[in-house]
Amino acid sequence: MIDDHGNFDTLFRHAVIVDGTGAPARIGDVATSGDRIAAIGDLGGAQARQNIEADGLVLSPGFIDAHTHDDALVLGGSAMEPKVSQGVTTVVTGNCGISLAPLVLDSSPPAPLDLLGDREGYRYARFADYLAEIEANPPAGNVAPMVGHTTLRVATMDSLDRAATQDEIRAMSRLLEESLQAGAIGFSTGLYYPLARAAPTEEVIDLLSLVSRFGAIYTTHMRDEEDGVELSLLESFDAAKRGRVPLVISHHKCMGSENHGRSVSTLNLIDEARTRQAVGLDAYPYVAGSTVLMDAMVRKSSRVLIAWSKPHPEIRGRDLSDIARQWDCSVNDAIERLSPAGAIYFHMSDEDVHRILAHPATMIGSDGLPHDEHPHPRLWGAFPRVLGHCVRDLNLFPLEEAVRKMTTLPATTFKLKNRGCIAVGNFADLVLFDPTAIADTATFEAPRQRAAGIRAVFVNGKTAAIDGVVEQARSGRVLRRAA
């Protein structure tokens, strides 16, 4: 706050201000007081407790990770190092139909719930209890939580290989309503996965009518991102339109070599839908994805790395084909012996990834899996990879546009009030970085590596990281759905 002598808390001097709106960068000073941005402009005569000389450095809003599985990472006063170290100040959780709450498990979580962690994490009968635990021991960054459809199915159904009955939909609706009342910003589905694959569109629409009543958002890991990707897009548009909710297509991609190039068609479909309804999408800057180990995904991939394996933890980080050769067995037999497990799948093309990233409606979402023993490098490197590789090296789009995709666009999409833009009165979530040096250093071989070029990160006005090293402050907040 401003003290009795008119001093600010923090003053960034002579920064290259990229405000998040897509407007051209400009040189100026930015001052913070308490948890807010207090002044912007030529503040040459101003005083502050902390002065940061930012000549040649970009000051932008803190990055908003539009697609995460950080539901467990944010608990226990977490440093959130994989995210904060790369400039992320807010994470959107509860994606792909899976959230830790509202669900209590007495046995190991079935896939894909195991992507979030072990049984111990599923201990919240109410979504409000989960949010209360985050607030009681805050993490380093902000949390914008969603509730997952698959989580609701597991909580209310005795068999998941069928459509929900009307009684089960009513039970899911009660849990969903409680979650939205507690502050969930949206609802997600993961119709690709076995636990939700049997859910018909009508089941989703029944639940979306409740989401609409609360003014919340719908995000989906679609039923098919392979041969039927266009049909799945049409299903998603139809569900959102009939449910009267804004839609986000999660980690949009075209999987499998036979589908490379289809992003021309899928993005045209998205553009057409956007003339009739609110549709957004997120993506990450890699040709490989990651999820649970499944034969169907292996068949679509040119290479598969094992991220974790319950029966064989020593195998993590190794190529599936090498494992099969070592064990003198088929790839299918190796999959069976490794499961339950997670994997990294190389199944996209650079051209599709770049085309999708460049689309004006695309937000950046890491889709990282912090529970994985050998995670995909996107967990640590997605945002600096966009700013370094995509912007500086490939010139896919201007720096200002990249920052918009990471800040104002997700803040607007998810209704995160007073965040995502450098403006007086907004929350002081800020990142200072060197545009000539910012880069991802995490690789598929060594994924747990901090980004280069991130000089400072502030969350709600407090220093969260300096030169990539997370500080002691735990100033993150739960960002509940705006009324």
Please name every model-derived segment.
Residues 101-108, 154-160, 201, 230-234, ...:
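Short acidic, glycine/serine/threonine-rich loops at helix termini
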Residues 163-189, 195-338, 344-363:
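Histidine/acidic residue-rich metal-binding segments in metalloenzymes
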Residues 60-67, 92-95, 217-222, 250, ...:
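Active-site neighborhood of phospho(di)ester-bond hydrolases with catalytic His/Asp-centered motifs
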Residues 76-185, 277:
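Divalent-metal coordination cores built from histidine and acidic residues
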Residues 96-97, 192, 222-224, 252, ...:
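Short, ordered loop/turn segments at secondary-structure junctions
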Residues 1-28, 33, 84, 296-483:
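Active-site microenvironment of metallo-dependent hydrolases
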